[in-house]
Amino acid sequence: IFFILSHTIDTVAVAISSHCELGVDIEQIRDLDNSYLNISQHFFTPQEATNIVSLPRYEGQLLFWKMWTLKEAYIKYRGKGLSLGLDCIEFHLTNKKLTSKYRGSPVYFSQWKICNSFLALASPLITPKITIELFPMQSQLYHHDYQLIHSSNGQN
């Protein structure tokens, strides 16, 4: 069994697979003042930073958090931590299409918006069925309808 954890302010994400390593990241969407601009310019690829900076503040921050969770999921999947660098992979997000550029074997990405957070999953396999359950810190279990916002075909 393979599993990985991620957490944000009041939510924990756990990804479990009986077949392969996974990468997961969850981040609560929150205001970063203008620091999201500096972070993206210093740690993302030049094209990603340009895409983020060119947007109005709110949309730029949303794109920043989408990119951040995808990058973190990928880095966790590869098992190398931040030593890989956040610019080791480049993402292009348009409508419901996600494409990526990186070196190595195919990786499949999925991303969801859950309440006020983005959740990203990286896997070497296309996973036909993904179950998401929310376990809030308050110890009550409740279920939400989740909206898939991006998915890739595993090709560079």
Question: Where do the model's predicted regions map?
Answer:
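Core catalytic alpha/beta fold that binds nucleotide/phospho-ligands
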Residues: 1-156
